[in-house]
């Protein structure tokens, strides 16, 4: 990729962040600027479904399609996630649920369950706990049976999310090495 291509690619990404579809069309169709997967990723972050559709229809390179789904999930853009996965056939991976949980988007997690998503990683629960999203944490653990680890306890404690911490402790989440939970009291080392 030459410097000019790299500059054009960055320009397309920046235009996608403006949410101005007509400008993106102009730089692609009239100015023939190059683009890459980060353009559709930016459109997903912004929740711009029409721009995503334009990117798909015009074969925006999507070697990292799963990131577009993850960004839509992280930002709570259900319509975009639905279109990317169901119509454009973009894959999703463990980041899709993990980033939705991190941002507290229970509706995204519910959609994933409806669609038989099964790529939950331990940090889905850790991300929910770290950011105080008790509803997501409970849903992941009780409905999805997502795995968890000691990081969830550490993050809930470090970020002062007592409701998440208590839920983790009450439900026997593993503790960080050297930590103890005895008689209703957490002891950290």
What are these regions (language model features)?
Residues 1-189:
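Ankyrin repeat (ANK) tandem alpha-helical domains that serve as protein-protein interaction scaffolds
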